């Protein structure tokens, strides 16, 4: 990633904020998981999951703890990735989180 002279890249700052604020990281993951059901938003959701993984140990360490090759995790959490349920569960478990099911709320429901 290109370094900014006298500054910090947006990506580096995002990783720092995710690392410093666990509630923010969890909220980011909740939005990311919601976006996975929409094909137009899926890539952004996967990148958000990737950013949280980077913030909590880096992709290499998360992959090792999750029992996944680093290359597979990079592919799965890329904008065109298609992670398996096994991969999602393993990554979330490594981050100290788990999947949860809630009732879908329609945007136009009263």
Regions found by a protein language model. Give the residues of each.
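Amphipathic alpha-helical interface surfaces
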Residues: 25, 45-49, 58, 69, ...
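Long, contiguous binding/interaction regions
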Residues: 107-110
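Short, residue-level hotspots on alpha-helical faces of the histone-fold
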Residues: 31, 51, 90-94
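N-terminal flexible/basic segments that precede or flank functional cores
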Residues: 1-48
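DNA major-groove recognition helix of helix-turn-helix/homeodomain DNA-binding modules
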Residues: 85-102
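Short alpha-helical DNA-recognition segment
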Residues: 51, 55-74
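Major-groove DNA-recognition helix of helix-turn-helix-type DNA-binding domains
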Residues: 80
């Amino acid at each position: 990633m290109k370094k900014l002279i006298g500054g910090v890249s947006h990506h580096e700052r995002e990783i720092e904020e995710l690392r410093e604020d666990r509630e923010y990281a969890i909220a980011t993951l909740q939005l990311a998981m919601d976006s996975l059901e929409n094909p137009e938003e899926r890539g952004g959701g996967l990148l958000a999951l990737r950013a949280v993984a980077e913030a909590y140990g880096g992709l290499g360490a998360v992959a090792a703890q999750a029992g996944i090759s680093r290359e597979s995790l990079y592919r799965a959490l890329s904008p065109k990735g298609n992670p398996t349920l096994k991969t999602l569960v393993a990554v979330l478990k490594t981050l100290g989180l788990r999947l949860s099911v809630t009732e879908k709320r329609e945007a136009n429901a009263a």
